[in-house]
């Protein structure tokens, strides 16, 4: 049927995608999901320290917390990877109020609340977003 025909652009895109997966090192570095899944515990700890420093520079208290990052999805619904998160101290706010303020921003910041802590799991946060997160957290807590 016509609905199943592939044009040259679709074939080229499929070829490029499959070629990227053939080089495991390239794939782990350049494909965002694979880069996140393959990040080592040491890399994540260093990343969490960098976010914590930016938060401190913005006047936000936080602590590092070791986490179990859920891989999720249909292929690995119960799999966890050891990771690191930055737990923001909410100041005068409750954890739920901090979560709501940051989630309702024009560019939402989505975190996880676990054991009454607001956790920013660094495995899935791009470093180029750290400064914006620190500024938003400082604004929310003020």
Which role does the model predict for each range below?
Residues 10, 94, 129:
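Short phosphate-engaging motifs
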């Amino acid at each position: 049927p016509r609905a199943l025909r592939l044009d040259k652009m679709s074939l080229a895109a499929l070829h490029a995608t499959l070629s990227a997966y053939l080089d495991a090192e390239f794939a782990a570095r350049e494909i965002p999901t694979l880069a996140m899944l393959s990040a080592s515990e040491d890399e994540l700890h260093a990343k969490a320290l960098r976010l914590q420093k930016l938060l401190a520079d913005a006047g936000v208290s936080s602590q590092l917390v070791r986490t179990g990052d859920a891989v999720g999805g249909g292929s690995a619904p119960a799999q966890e990877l050891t990771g690191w998160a930055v737990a923001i101290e909410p100041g005068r706010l409750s954890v739920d109020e901090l979560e709501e303020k940051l989630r309702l921003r024009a560019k939402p910041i989505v975190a996880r609340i676990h054991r009454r802590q607001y956790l920013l799991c660094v495995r899935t946060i791009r470093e180029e977003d750290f400064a914006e997160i620190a500024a938003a957290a400082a604004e929310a807590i003020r």
